[in-house]
Regions:
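Sec/Tat signal peptide C-region and signal peptidase I cleavage site
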Residues: 26-32
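Extended amphipathic alpha-helical interaction segments
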Residues: 135-233
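A cross-kingdom marker for long, charged
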Residues: 214-291
Length: 291
């Protein structure tokens, strides 16, 4: 499979899955939380915040993007990428990475303040909405909501609040970095599986990937903004302002930064496993035919 096909056909769908994940995450490190009680609080934080739910949606989201038939993408390549993703994006190892980073980044007070917000009626409603939006099944509903926004664009105040949420949670930047890592991992993995005489030199490959990124980053950025509008569509401006007040508080800032860093670490680890698994998976699927 050529690099151009990967970049043109396959990754726009996977970019949708990555954006779906990225916008659902909210992202000063002091004395780290430690001990059994602190570990229990971190686990509760991961559940109450929806981070654990989001991590569990990564593999289904990746598979939905990969397995959607695309012109020019052979069935054997989709099968190989699906196998590699299944190996790489298992939730268990990813959760261990997230848990370790969150435990080292947040102190007891920051965890307590964050749980206080998450356990509030508004915090619980927001988490439920974010969880729903992070599931692969939501993609069709989000696309339908995009048409609704075309007919009735959001008010300026709502658009400004969504922009603030994007910046406060780090959703857009996280999605962009994940997308770049994902494109490069797949390109390197597929390239490594080619016969030696057909492989693209590493520096040329990276230049080709870099050239493809502006369009994909723009696409992902638009999807993140749309996803945020969809996620918070049932909330008033005042409720979103309350959410922003938490995110801008010292503990909210610490939580958001820790969440983004933890998720980025887990995704980069998984992308590395994905890249390493692709050549063997492609070899396994050689000769498979189909659309």
């Amino acid at each position: 499979m050529s690099l151009s096909v990967i970049l043109r056909c396959e990754f726009p769908r996977v970019a949708a899955a990555i954006a779906l994940i990225g916008w659902s995450l909210a992202g000063h490190i002091s004395h780290a939380a430690s001990g059994p009680e602190a570990a229990g609080k971190v686990d509760r934080l991961l559940d109450a915040s929806g981070m654990a739910h989001t991590v569990r949606q990564i593999l289904p989201g990746m598979l939905e993007g990969i397995n959607s038939p695309q012109p020019g993408v052979p069935a054997n390549v989709r099968g190989a990428l699906s196998d590699a993703a299944t190996q790489a994006f298992q939730p268990g190892p990813m959760m261990e990475k997230v848990r370790a980073r969150m435990s080292s980044a947040l102190n007891d007070r920051q965890i307590g303040d964050t749980l206080g917000w998450l356990d509030s009626p508004l915090g619980s409603r927001i988490t439920a909405a974010e969880n729903e939006a992070s599931e692969p099944a939501a993609l069709g509903r989000i696309e339908a909501y995009a048409k609704e926004l075309e007919r009735r664009p959001p008010a300026k105040q709502r658009a400004n609040l969504i922009g603030e949420l994007n910046r406060a949670t780090g959703s857009g930047e996280l999605t962009a970095s994940m997308l770049e890592a994902g494109v490069l991992a797949s390109a390197l993995g597929v390239n490594a599986a080619q016969p030696a005489q057909q492989r693209v030199p590493g520096d040329v490959l990276q230049k080709q990937v870099k050239a493809s990124l502006p369009h994909l980053r723009q696409q992902a950025g638009q999807m993140v903004t749309l996803g945020l509008h969809y996620s918070y569509r049932a909330f008033t401006d005042k409720e979103i302002e309350s959410y922003l007040n938490f995110l801008k508080s010292p503990s909210g800032v610490a939580y958001s930064k820790a969440a983004v860093s933890a998720f980025r670490d887990a995704m980069l680890d998984a992308m590395g496993r994905f890249m390493q698994a692709i050549p063997k998976a492609l070899d396994k699927h050689k000769g498979v035919t189909g659309a």
